[in-house]
Amino acid sequence: MKLWQNLAAAAVLGLAATASAADAGVHAFTLNLNDGAPKKLADYKGKVLLIVNTASKCGYTKQYAPMEQLYQKYKDRGFEVLAFPANNFMGQEPGTNEEIRAFCTAKFNTTFPLFAKISVKGDDIHPLYKYLTTLPEFSGDITWNFNKFLVDPGGKVVARFGTRVDPMSEELTKKLEEILPKRQ
């Protein structure tokens, strides 16, 4: 009897944790910044986010430049780009967090938040990416570097863009403009 009670309690707690993530969206997660400091994504409540898995040795690495351009264009309207380096695809992000930061700063002069390297697929997938890739309307594994998730100010994912979608493309910026606060 005690076993069944414990199993029932565990199931309820598991559902509560899932419901909590569903209610809070991406704001339910905490990850480490590139320097190792923990960062609650709840700190970004009220802001529109573009979450991107990145790599320094990929044919799409050049997307760091339009990511920075997008960030500079919209940051004063409550927009953040969050970059998550990942080494899941052909070893294209082999560096340490320090090396990744140095590369992004020197090559692309990035100023948006850069997080510590994580896994975006497989058995060691980070819980944030597990959440992102199992949302019914945006489900599916991350298949390459520079996949993008657009998140509204409440933490809800509103769009997913593939690797080939340039951050400054009309497709992405049009959707971004729809959810950003209007200019006064």
Model segments located where?
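Bacterial N-terminal signal peptides
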Residues: 8-16
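N-terminal "domain-start" segment that seeds a small globular fold
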Residues: 20-42, 127
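Amphipathic alpha-helical repeat scaffolds
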Residues: 53-57
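Structural microenvironment flanking redox-active thiols in thiol-disulfide oxidoreductases
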Residues: 60-126
